[in-house]
C-alpha cells in the first residue's frame, strides 16, 4: 500500500513538471514570436524609409512592366519628390524632365552624354501613345543600355499629371528621371574650363521662368558658361527646366557664395578684369552698345571677352558686385523705367554675343 502511494506521488510530480514545462515552453514560444514580430516591424519601417532611394538606385532591369495606375507607387512618389524638392534633387543628383521632344534634344546633343554624367535613369510614358512612338524615343534616351533592354514604363493619365505637375496631361507624353550635370564651385570651374570668353552671371535671380529663359538665350547667343550666385533659383527647378528647353543640361554652369570668391575666380582663373569686362546691368551706366563696340575692338587676346552680371528685378545686383563691376545700361527712349530681367539679358547677350 505504501509502495502504491509512493508511486502515485511520483507520477503526480512527473505530470505536474510536464505541465509546467509545456506552459513554460508555450510562454517562451510566444515571446519568441513577439520578438520576431517586432523585428519584422522594424525592418519594414526601415525598408519603407529607404524605398525612395532604393527606387532610384535600381537599374530598371525588369523589362516590360504593367501600366502604373496608382499615384502611391514608390517610383511615382520618387519622381514627384525629385520634381518638388531641391534638397532631394541635390542629394540624388537627379531631376525630372517632362516631354519627349525635350528628352530627344538633350540626348541627341553632341555637347554631352554619359561622359558628362548625364543619363536617363527611368522614364514614364503616357499609355495613350503607341509602342512605335515609345520605342523611337527609348532608343535615344536609353541608347547605352541596349544590353539591359531598359525601356519606359506606361502610366495612366492620373499618374502622368502627378509626376509632371500639370493640370492636364494630354500634351505630356514622357516624364523621365535624368541625372544632373555637375555645377562646380567658381574657382574649381575656372581651373578646369578652357576658352571661356563669354559668361552670363545671375546674382539672385529668383524667378524660375526667367532663369530658364536666360539659360536658353545664353546658349542661343553662344555664351560659354552661366554662373549662379546666392539666392538664384535652381536651374533644375521644374519651371526653370520647362523654360530652358534642356539648355541647363548643355550649358556649363558654376556657382559662387561670396563676392570675394566670385571676383577671385573670374580674375585668377578666367582672366577677366573687374571694372573693365565684368559688366553689371544697371539702371544708370554706360550705353551697352558703346561698351560692346569698345570691348570688341580691343587688339589683344581679350577681344570680345565679357562677363555680364544680372541681378533680381527687385533689388538688382548685390552691393559688392556693383562696386567692383563696370555699370552699363540699355538705352530705352520710352518711359518704361526698367525691363524684365530675361528681356534685358537677351538684349545684352545679343549685343555682346557677336
Question: Where in the sequence are the language-model features?
Answer:
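N-terminal mitochondrial targeting presequence
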Residues: 1-53
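Boundary-proximal intrinsically disordered activation/regulatory segments immediately upstream
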Residues: 33-131, 232
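Amphipathic alpha-helical repeat scaffolds
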Residues: 99, 206-214, 338-344
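Short, aromatic/basic amphipathic alpha-helical patches
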Residues: 132-146, 320-321
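RNA substrate-binding interface of SAM-dependent RNA methyltransferases
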Residues: 142, 152-153, 177, 181-288
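A glycine-rich helix N-cap at a beta->alpha junction
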Residues: 145-164
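Structured adenosyl-cofactor binding patch, chiefly the S-adenosyl-L-methionine
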Residues: 174-176, 217-221, 232-249, 318-354
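Active-site/ligand-binding-proximal alpha/beta "capping" segment
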Residues: 281-336
Amino acid at each position: 500500500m505504501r509502495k502504491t502511494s509512493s508511486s502515485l506521488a511520483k507520477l503526480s510530480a512527473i505530470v505536474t513538471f510536464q505541465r509546467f514545462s509545456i506552459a513554460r515552453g508555450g510562454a517562451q514560444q510566444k515571446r519568441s514570436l513577439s520578438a520576431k514580430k517586432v523585428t519584422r516591424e522594424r525592418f519594414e519601417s526601415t525598408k519603407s524609409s529607404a524605398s525612395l532611394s532604393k527606387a532610384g538606385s535600381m537599374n530598371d532591369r525588369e523589362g516590360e512592366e504593367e501600366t502604373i495606375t496608382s499615384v502611391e507607387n514608390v517610383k511615382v512618389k520618387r519622381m514627384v519628390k525629385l520634381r518638388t524638392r531641391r534638397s532631394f534633387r541635390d542629394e540624388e543628383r537627379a531631376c525630372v524632365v517632362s516631354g519627349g521632344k525635350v528628352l530627344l534634344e538633350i540626348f541627341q546633343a553632341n555637347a554631352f552624354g554619359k561622359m558628362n554624367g548625364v543619363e536617363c535613369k527611368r522614364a514614364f510614358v503616357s499609355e495613350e501613345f503607341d509602342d512605335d512612338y515609345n520605342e523611337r524615343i527609348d532608343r535615344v534616351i536609353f541608347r547605352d543600355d541596349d544590353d539591359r533592354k531598359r525601356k519606359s514604363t506606361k502610366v495612366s493619365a492620373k499618374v502622368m499629371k502627378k509626376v509632371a505637375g500639370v493640370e492636364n496631361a494630354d500634351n505630356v507624353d514622357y516624364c523621365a528621371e535624368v541625372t544632373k550635370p555637375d555645377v562646380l564651385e567658381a574657382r574649381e570651374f575656372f581651373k578646369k574650363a578652357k576658352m571661356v570668353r563669354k559668361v552670363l552671371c545671375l546674382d539672385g535671380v529668383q524667378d524660375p521662368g526667367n532663369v530658364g529663359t536666360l539659360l536658353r538665350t545664353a546658349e542661343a547667343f553662344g555664351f560659354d558658361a552661366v554662373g549662379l550666385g546666392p539666392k538664384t533659383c535652381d536651374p533644375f527647378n521644374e519651371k526653370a527646366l520647362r523654360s530652358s528647353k534642356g539648355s541647363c543640361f548643355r550649358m556649363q554652369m558654376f556657382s559662387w557664395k561670396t563676392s570675394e570668391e566670385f571676383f577671385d575666380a573670374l580674375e585668377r582663373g578666367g582672366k577677366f578684369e573687374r571694372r573693365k569686362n565684368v559688366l553689371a546691368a544697371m539702371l544708370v551706366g554706360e550705353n551697352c552698345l558703346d561698351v560692346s563696340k569698345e570691348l570688341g575692338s580691343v587688339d589683344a587676346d581679350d577681344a570680345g571677352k565679357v562677363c555680364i552680371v544680372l541681378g533680381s528685378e527687385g533689388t538688382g545686383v548685390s552691393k559688392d558686385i556693383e562696386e567692383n563691376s563696370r555699370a552699363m545700361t540699355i538705352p530705352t527712349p520710352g518711359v518704361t523705367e526698367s525691363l524684365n530681367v530675361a528681356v534685358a539679358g537677351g538684349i545684352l547677350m545679343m549685343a555682346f554675343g557677336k
